[in-house]
Structure formats: C-alpha cells, structure tokens
C-alpha cells in the first residue's frame, strides 16, 4: 500500500468499455512528486490523504481481476500530517 494525496479529478469521458464509469483522480505521494492516476473506489475529494494499492490488488479493489487499473484508492486517511 501507498499513502498518497488526491490533487484533482481527472475527466475522461471516452474510455474503453471495461473501465465503466468509475471516477479517476490525480494523486501524488507529496506535492511536487510525479503524478499518477488512480481509480477512486470509495468517493474521495481533492486534498484527501488516501491509501492506494497497485498491481493485481488494484484490479481486485476496483471490482474485477480483469479491470484495467494499476492503482486504486481503497481508503481515506482520517488524520495524517503528510510527512
């Protein structure tokens, strides 16, 4: 698992059918770090600190072993100082 922060929503209306309509968010480990795109499985907002999983765990967390994701948000952290 990784601790990451949600930077903003990513709008992508034209997708492959397997992705469905799950929200996509831009996340990073800290401001200035490389950005990544994560599937939002729980309903996050920009500024939230979240727990993310990758690889096959990301696909299963998104709802299916065949889901095309390599990063999925699985939890919102209630308190985190960002260090």
From Swiss-Prot:
Domain BMV intervals: 1-78
Record keywords, A-Z: Bacterial microcompartment, Carbon dioxide fixation, Carboxysome
Gene3D superfamilies, alphabetized: EutN/Ccml
Chief location category: other
Gene knockout outcome: A double csoS4a-csoS4B disruption does not grow in ambient air, has a wild-type growth rate in 5% CO(2), called a high-CO(2) requiring phenotype, hcr. It does not grow to the same cell density as wild-type. 1/3 fewer carboxysomes are seen per cell, about 13% of which are elongated. The carboxysome shell is more permeable than usual to inorganic carbon. Required for growth in ambient air.
Subcellular location: Carboxysome
SUPFAM superfamilies reported in the protein's UniProt record: EutN/CcmL-like
One GO-annotated biological process of the protein: carbon fixation
Domain of life (superkingdom): Bacteria
Entry GO terms, CC: carboxysome
Transmembrane segments: none
Function statement: Probably forms vertices in the carboxysome, a polyhedral inclusion where RuBisCO (ribulose bisphosphate carboxylase, cbbL-cbbS) is sequestered. Has been modeled to induce curvature upon insertion into an otherwise flat hexagonal layer of major carboxysome subunits. A minor shell protein, only 12 pentamers of CsoS4A/CsoS4B are calculated to be present in each carboxysome. The 2 CsoS4 proteins contribute to the impermeability of the carboxysome to CO(2).
Family: Belongs to the CcmL/EutN family. CsoS4 subfamily.
Notes on the domains: The tight homopentamer forms a pore with an opening of about 3.5 Angstroms in diameter which is positively charged. A short loop (residues 30-33) protrudes above the center of the concave face to different degrees.
Protein name as catalogued: Carboxysome shell vertex protein CsoS4A
Organism: Halothiobacillus neapolitanus (strain ATCC 23641 / c2) (Thiobacillus neapolitanus)
Gene name of this polypeptide: csoS4A
